[in-house]
Amino acid sequence: MEENNELINNPAVEYTDDNIRHLSDMEHVRTRPGMYIGKLGDGSHAEDGIYVLLKEIIDNSIDEFKMQAGKKIEIIIEENLRVSVRDYGRGIPQGKLIEAVSVLNTGGKYDSKAFKKSVGLNGVGVKAVNALSSRFEVRSYRDGKVRIATFAKGDLLTDTTQNTTEENGTYIFFEPDNLLFENYSFRPEFVETMLRNYTYLNTGLAIIYNGQRILSRNGLVDLLNDNMTAVGLYPIIHLKGEDIEIAFTHTGQYGEEYYSFVNGQHTTQGGTHQSAFKEHIARTIKEYFNKNMDYADIRNGLVAAIAVNVEEPLFESQTKIKLGSTNMAPGGPTVNKFVGDFVKTEVDNYLHKHTDVADVMLQKIQESEKERKAIAGVTKLARERAKKANLHNRKLRDCRFHLNDAKGDKKEESCIFITEGDSASGSITKSRDVNTQAVFSLRGKPLNSYGLTKKIVYENEEFNLLQAALNIEDGMEGLRYNKVIVATDADVDGMHIRLLLITFFLQFFPDLIKKGHVYILQTPLFRVRNRKKGVYETVYCYSEEERIAAIERLSPNPEITRFKGLGEISPDEFKHFIGKDMRLEQVSLRKTDLVKELLEFYMGKNTMERQ
């Protein structure tokens, strides 16, 4: 039930029985979608709501596979808009089919005997998909009968039962409601990443996505091999136990990288299982070598994956991206103890049996320690300098809300524009949203950091101040902005500055790019306008093709302006380019890219090959 907001805003309004509203389950989901799927979005980001809808449907099919009912899931996404999912499990019990997809808190997964370690939250998930779809259809195939029900925005339209020769299982079709997910589109790369993660966690499961077969034979080893952007220093260590699987290696890159899962769910923000692994992997390695090692040196360059199965898992949000459970099961061991005991026993045994791997690991840790100590003096001075500069730093014009705030609904909107020079930063500063948009101004071209050690991050004032502004010296957990946006001119010099900044991030903070935080701001190349009936009609063009189309539309004799740099765009105009319709291009790495080779080719010495 809800109280009318008018009562709160205007106490003089009479408060009667008529002010009390009861919402049906489907109405409640549509009225408060964020409670069920997080943010809505349009599909341009991997966390957007349409991917949560897809995941909720697939989760139920995955649970069938886990119950050894069906080894194949077929998924078709038509025109990146309409989704159908067919599994070959047992099929939803037909007598309760309507309730199972339309009545909240109805489902078989409350019976832990049937689904002891379930990923699909049957009480809510599929119902939310139904409510938030303009069209929804479910078919349950069981023992020669198929029951078919169709819905629109959660309302039942048709319900029929007929004979069938098809195999048992469930078919679901849905089309997200464009009124809620405005101009949405499923991005194949986000969908494929999601589906591959399902196969890594469920070896032997075949997912057929738009005709493409996705399969994993080696679980988390395949995950690391497919996602690592640097060569492992030793073969991936892969260890499995009851309800736990881990895989890890070290690379020559800076930082740490983790992939964590609970009951097949990718916990992108980690949680108690990932924290336990980080703590105990470092402690176990330190105890094995029996040396006075710093945990940061042990974990530097570590790339790891951990998957656990938890009974009745508790997540910190409905989207299930961070595990909050303290216990593996009601009355069972804590997550920390369970993970710690496994890591301590299995990793220690492995290192004793594979001393050649242990030798490589020790060498890597000692190299990290040597570099850390070499820059210790510099980092202390740099931190003091950055602290003083941050108090009156003209380079950083900060915003009010940040990604690492404890609370707040604007955290995800926080961003920082990295610009070149005062003219460009001045225009952005005057037109920005001070609540969520910060500006960092570079002084000319930054240093080419390729091949340099992390010492340069502290010795170079601009790099040190940028690192301090982002708050990433000690890892991504403290990152202050969800989007780090490079805003440079669209000329050769601007492109060079982009490359230099991306090199800096890839060299020292690769997770910033791997986790999808870095973007390029697309600004218009042309302004085409024409005065009609005393009013200017203006079109901003981002390409030559758009310019030609605008000239045709605004003919005859339109006025054409070419923007040579960001500084030429007035603050009044700039606000159009950094508002809700801001065009951003995400900086991403292909799975086949190796960072070292990539940087060597583009930013290394001018060899014959590069020429």
Regions inferred by a protein language model and the residue ranges of each:
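Conserved short strand/loop->alpha-helix "switch" segment adjacent to the catalytic nucleotide/phosphoryl-transfer site
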Residues: 32-54
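GHKL-family ATPase ATP-binding module
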Residues: 1-19, 50-55, 63-66, 70-88, ...
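C-terminal interaction appendages of subunits in large macromolecular complexes
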Residues: 370-391, 406-410, 414-415, 426, ...
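Flexible beta-alpha connector loops of hexameric P-loop NTPases
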Residues: 40-48, 268-269, 330, 448-459
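Conserved helix-loop functional segments at active or binding sites
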Residues: 31, 35-38, 59, 63, ...
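Interdomain boundary/hinge elements
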Residues: 113-114, 146-151, 206-210, 510-529
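A short glycine-centered beta->alpha linker in the GHKL/HATPase_c
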Residues: 91-94
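Alpha-helix capping/hinge segments and adjacent helical runs
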Residues: 25-26
